[in-house]
């Protein structure tokens, strides 16, 4: 993932070095500050500064915010000496909420009569009420909130709509596990109504926690519009949608194969199926079995041919399903079996069943024996063959995973016990032909960990072909944008081959299907297919009327049974973008906020949720649900592993925000649903990754880190150390604003003005204003393009490298000097940069930006009339264009290169505390003029006593005993070392360092040249060896050059 300074991933070693560099820089700045203070007149030192300096001698205590909830935070006192995330984050959110800043109506107060076309809507992807939010939710919420805040500050009527999803199967499983663990009960012990009461209790408990987490993350949502997918208005919308789609024929009932979890006794969706890839024989734990079950093998057995001594050998990975076989298929071109086509096989265990041998081109002649057993009721491919060949369908596995009646001696056995029993019985009959390893994929239920069985069930389906065509067309013609664009291929591939959607689930928790099965009071025969005896209705009375009309009988003759199944969770969540606004009613909110602007979510549910929202919206409203689909990558741990509770690497965003000890982190594992072995593994993983726990980072640092990781299309390997690095960035912001506040006062020369006196501004003032203008332009462009990595990079670089490292350091002599005109300009520029910079980062880091912005003095301009930064105007590119100065920026870029080289030379000679004199010999008159303009910057940032700019004709003025640096062919830099260093001693010291590095290089070279190095040493270790060697060789080159220079001084 890219970081604010570049695009290459940073190693832990690099992050550590970066932290050390930051610490050194902080020390350097402090020394510079003290030196400047000594030189300044005592009377010019503000009382505040003296007090702050005194406080720095002791460790600062975290202040406590005592502002009553909902009131504007009290920040009248002096700014605290250090940045404390908890203190900064307290108070603001409740005030924002109470003032109504998050409500779309707030913009109407500011701009009465604003155009509804300026509305901007984001519906939060509703998290499941199965537990707390994880860091993946934090990423999504941060991205969505950043977009919302950015548009709000641009004056749009924004709505970020919150909510939670009932998550049918996931929530039911969690509650069932808790009931079993805590009270030893099953849902069947309670019954449907009492069990659902337990789930509602869970929802109320977890929903409050989830909403509190959203608040902690700074989500600027309109809480008055929060929706739960089982709220009455959602229930009404779901019922209405089902009935309309059923009556139009889009929803229908059919007997088809479904993904069946025997442990849950329910069909599950494709997204709830995990796929275990096996390379061969593997033992897998299956719920309900004491011993692990073997998978990844191909068993072969023979069917005898009726009326013949011949046999045909078939192979299968699920030999127990031979009890449901309906036939044997061979390829029409397979000469080995042509004479058997049309004949019958004898089933060895079910004498009444003969199996036809037939030709079908789907058979792969080279796989196994080339003959395939066909089990239409338990295999998706076989189902299609069974339909095509008109074969009978034999269910051999029951809903709870037992062998069905009618399967001979195996009836009533557990399915995998029958697997072993069938093999033994085949051996006894001389029909078993052995087994071999077979790479395969085993589908398992993500909720119960059970092995999925394809089972034939009458279910409700949605016809998807026509909706999929419209969804593909919407993307193709540009009405619907997918970002990043490479996901379009996935969109098209899925939708162009989409199957009808099974929407019924055999659960108790969820939207009960508004359909009724019709039978007759007189018990008459019902000859039509089962699907013909269903009606959908809002009430039982309506169903009765519909049934009577359908069969032209009196209502008194009708018996109704309400379908006990519930709808797939994706059905109700597929209606989320419009049902939350009151559909099917034509509400004001529907008019203002639907369709939405953008849908942001993970790419893993592009088909399962996003496509279905497009389906449902177009089908029921005739509109697309949103204009853009923004997809983020998956978050993994720092090692690139998928986050899993059993690995102990799932990160709770609140733990990162507040910090947590290792003991408390591990204690959390005991409150989950992990078994003892999983807890032990998870604890080991946590101890390895977080030996000292997780440090307090604060929400602004977490948000900024997550946004910096969002390089489009890449998985995110989240490293908490990096998040903590951004807490240090927050501290940098805090300290620079604190520095500015100590120097701003009501004195004319220390009071900032909105209009800056550019004629009196120094080149440094003009340069930082140009850099500010560029930051405003690039941040606006990045956020409009959803390029959050670029937005964090631009703002980080401006604040840290341009403003703090260069501008603030350079103007310190001006602020402590006697020139009141220059001081007043510097104060105004300082204020302008801080105010603008805080507004730039407000959507990204809302808490620290509000805290610091509120502490800054307000100026006489419309930009400063807003009560809060979150409703202030975002910096507009056109307002800052007047400050752009490419020529000056190029000059400073050159100066920074020169300063870097001088600092490196100072480090080589250990001149940390020594003032130097420097001469710069320019090659051209233009460069001489440019260097004279920026000499003050060079003087300050190289810690020089004096810097002289010479032209190339003045080389005779170069002082003897000077070290030399060439700078890009444009100038030569000379640093006078006479009397500053002990040359022989320095040569000796550098010689020792040179020898040490040469020994290290030789050792690495010897290791690399060993005979088995390429074969035995992993690629990543070899890369590290080469990197270390290259670094040492570069150091050797620099030391050698330094020694040569020192010798020349003698």
Curated annotation (Swiss-Prot):
Disulphide bonds in the chain: none
Pfam families registered for this protein in UniProt: Anticodon_1 (PF08264), tRNA-synt_1 (PF00133)
GO molecular function, one term: ATP binding
Family matches, as CDD domains: Anticodon_Ia_Val (cd07962), ValRS_core (cd00817)
GO biological process: determination of adult lifespan; valyl-tRNA aminoacylation
Region (Disordered), start-end ranges: 37-72
Binding residues annotated for ATP, in chain numbering: 645
Entry EC number(s): 6.1.1.9
GO CC aspect terms: cytosol
Keyword Zinc-finger set for record: no
Basic and acidic residues: bias regions: 37-57
The entry's keywords: Aminoacyl-tRNA synthetase, ATP-binding, Ligase, Nucleotide-binding, Protein biosynthesis
Family designation: Belongs to the class-I aminoacyl-tRNA synthetase family.
Name used for this protein in its record: Valine--tRNA ligase
Organism encoding this protein: Caenorhabditis elegans
Gene name as annotated: glp-4
């Amino acid at each position: 993932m890219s970081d604010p300074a570049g695009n290459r991933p940073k190693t832990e070693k690099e992050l550590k070095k970066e932290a050390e560099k930051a610490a050194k820089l902080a020390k350097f700045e402090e020394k510079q500050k003290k030196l400047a203070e000594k030189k300044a007149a005592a009377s010019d030192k503000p009382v505040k500064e003296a007090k702050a300096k005194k406080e720095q001698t002791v460790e600062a205590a975290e202040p406590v915010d005592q502002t009553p909830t909902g009131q504007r935070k009290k920040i009248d006192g002096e700014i605290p000496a250090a940045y404390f995330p908890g203190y900064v984050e307290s108070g603001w959110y409740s005030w924002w909420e109470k003032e109504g800043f998050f409500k779309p109506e707030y913009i109407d107060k500011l701009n009465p009569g604003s155009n509804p076309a300026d509305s901007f809507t984001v519906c939060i992807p509703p998290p499941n009420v199965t537990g707390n939010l994880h860091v993946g939710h934090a990423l999504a919420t941060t991205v969505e909130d950043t977009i919302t805040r950015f548009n709000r500050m641009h004056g749009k009527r924004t709505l970020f709509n919150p909510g939670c999803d009932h998550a049918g199967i996931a929530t039911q499983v969690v509650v069932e596990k808790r009931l079993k663990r805590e009270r030893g009960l099953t849902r069947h012990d309670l019954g449907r109504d009492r069990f659902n009461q337990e789930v509602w209790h869970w929802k109320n408990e977890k929903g409050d926690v989830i909403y509190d987490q959203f608040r902690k993350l700074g989500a600027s949502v309109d809480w008055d519009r929060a929706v739960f997918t089982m709220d009455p208005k959602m229930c009404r919308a779901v019922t209405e949608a089902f009935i309309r789609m059923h009556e139009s024929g889009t929803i229908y009932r059919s007997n088809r194969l479904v993904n069946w979890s025997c442990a849950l006794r329910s069909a599950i969706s494709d997204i709830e199926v995990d796929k275990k890839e096996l390379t061969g024989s593997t033992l897998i734990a299956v719920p309900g079995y004491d011993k692990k079950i073997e998978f990844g093998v191909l068993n072969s057995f023979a069917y005898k041919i009726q009326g013949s001594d011949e046999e045909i050998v078939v192979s299968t990975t699920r030999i127990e399903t031979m009890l449901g076989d309906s036939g044997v298929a061979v390829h029409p071109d397979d000469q080995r079996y042509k004479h058997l086509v049309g004949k019958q096989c004898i089933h060895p265990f079910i004498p009444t069943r003969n199996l036809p041998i037939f030709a079908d081109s789907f058979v792969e002649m080279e796989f196994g024996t080339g003959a395939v057993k066909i089990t239409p009721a338990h295999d998706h491919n076989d189902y299609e063959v069974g339909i095509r060949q008109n074969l009978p369908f034999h269910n051999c596995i029951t809903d709870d995973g037992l062998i069905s009646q009618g399967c001979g001696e195996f009836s009533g056995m557990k399915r995998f016990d029958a697997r072993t029993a069938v093999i033994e019985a085949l051996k006894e009959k001389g029909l078993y032909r052995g087994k071999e390893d077979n790479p395969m994929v085993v589908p398992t239920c993500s909720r119960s960990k059970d092995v999925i069985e394809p089972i034939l069930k009458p279910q409700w389906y949605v016809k998807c072909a026509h909706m999929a065509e419209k969804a593909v067309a919407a993307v193709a013609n540009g009405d619907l944008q997918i970002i990043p664009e490479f996901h379009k291929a996935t969109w098209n591939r899925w939708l162009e081959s989409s199957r009808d959607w099974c929407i019924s689930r055999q659960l108790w928790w969820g939207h009960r299907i508004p359909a009724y099965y019709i039978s007759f009071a007189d018990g008459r025969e019902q000859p039509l297919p089962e699907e013909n005896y269903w009606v959908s209705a809002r009430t039982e009375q309506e169903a009765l009327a519909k049934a009577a009309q359908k069969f032209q009988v009196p209502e008194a003759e009708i018996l109704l049974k309400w379908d006990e199944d519930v709808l797939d969770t994706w059905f109700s969540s597929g209606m989320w973008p419009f049902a939350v606004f009151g559909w099917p009613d034509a509400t004001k909110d529907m008019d203002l906020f639907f369709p939405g602007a953008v849908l942001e979510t993970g790419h893993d549910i592009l088909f399962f949720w996003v496509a279905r929202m497009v389906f449902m919206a177009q089908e029921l409203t005739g509109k697309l649900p949103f204009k853009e689909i923004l997809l983020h990558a998956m978050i993994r741990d720092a090692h690139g592993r998928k986050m899993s509770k059993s690995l102990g690497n799932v990160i709770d965003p609140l733990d990162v925000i507040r910090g947590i000890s290792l003991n408390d982190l591990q204690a959390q594992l005991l409150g989950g649903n992990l078994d003892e072995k999983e807890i032990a593994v998870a604890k080991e993983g946590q101890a390895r990754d977080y030996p000292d726990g997780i440090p307090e980072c604060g929400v602004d640092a977490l948000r900024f880190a997550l946004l910096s990781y969002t390089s489009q299309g890449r998985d995110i390997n989240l490293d908490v150390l990096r998040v903590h690095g951004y807490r240090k960035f927050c501290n940098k912001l805090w300290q620079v604003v604190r520095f500015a506040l100590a120097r701003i006062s009501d004195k004319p020369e220390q009071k900032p003005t909105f209009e800056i006196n550019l004629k009196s501004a120094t080149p440094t003032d003009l340069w930082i204003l140009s850099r500010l203008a560029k930051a405003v332009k690039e941040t606006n462009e990045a956020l409009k393009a959803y390029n959050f990595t670029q937005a964090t990079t631009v703002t980080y670089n401006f604040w840290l490298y341009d403003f703090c490292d260069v501008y603030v350091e350079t103007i310190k002599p001006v602020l402590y000097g006697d020139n009141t005109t220059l001081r007043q300009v510097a104060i105004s520029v300082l204020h302008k940069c801080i105010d603008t910079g805080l507004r730039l980062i407000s959507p990204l880091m809302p808490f620290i930006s509000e805290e610091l912005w509120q502490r800054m003095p307000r100026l006489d301009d419309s930009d400063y009339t807003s009560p809060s930064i979150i409703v202030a105007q975002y910096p507009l590119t056109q307002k800052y264009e007047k400050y752009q100065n490419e020529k000056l920026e190029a000059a400073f870029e050159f100066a920074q290169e020169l300063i870097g080289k001088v600092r490196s030379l100072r480090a080589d000679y250990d001149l940390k505390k020594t003032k130097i004199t420097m001469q710069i010999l320019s090659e051209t008159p233009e460069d001489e003029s440019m260097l004279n303009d920026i000499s003050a910057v060079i003087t300050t940032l190289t810690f020089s006593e004096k810097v002289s700019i010479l032209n190339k004709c003045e080389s005779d003025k170069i002082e003897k005993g000077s070290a030399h640096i060439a700078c890009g062919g444009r100038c030569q830099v000379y640093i006078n070392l006479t009397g500053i260093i002990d040359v022989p001693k320095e040569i000796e010291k550098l010689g020792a360092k040179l020898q040490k590095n040469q020994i290290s290089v030789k050792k690495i070279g010897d290791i690399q040249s060993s005979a088995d190095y390429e074969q035995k040493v992993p690629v990543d270790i070899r890369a590290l060896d080469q990197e270390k060697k290259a670094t040492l060789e570069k150091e050797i080159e620099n030391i050698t050059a330094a020694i040569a220079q020192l010798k020349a001084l003698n």
